[in-house]
Swiss-Prot record:
This is Small ribosomal subunit protein uS8. NCBIfam families: PRK00136.1. Coiled coil: none annotated. Part of the 30S ribosomal subunit. Contacts proteins S5 and S12. The gene is rpsH. One of the primary rRNA binding proteins, it binds directly to 16S rRNA central domain where it helps coordinate assembly of the platform of the 30S subunit. GO terms for cellular component: ribonucleoprotein complex; ribosome.
Amino acid sequence: MANHDPISDMLTRIRNASQKRHENTRIPASRMSRSIAKVLQNEGFISQVSEEGEGVKTQLVLELKYSGKHRHPTIRSMKRVSKPGLRIYKNNRGLPKVLGGLGVAIISTSKGVMSDRDARKQGVGGEVLCYVY
């Protein structure tokens, strides 16, 4: 079956694996998924990103993070904002603060995919891909 929104698919796979407390999850590799995974790793939501396979069958393996003795997921919620049917763009002044700065908005800018904090520092806006907190 064709996947029409790979970003939503990626977020759903991470959300489901995190709720079931899996150690890692596999995601089809693309430039966008690599960039989003890198932002999630830099922001401390996942511990490690690695690649397996070759060519078209390359997959990203994301090692998820948990906290406490009951292994509470670090990622509480992931919400897709800009969708294929309704794109959401914001300038650098209009970039959202997720949970008053506790969460992260992942933004696709002309300078690459980055967190809302990095986009504000660089003074760029772009497409708001998702919220993570």
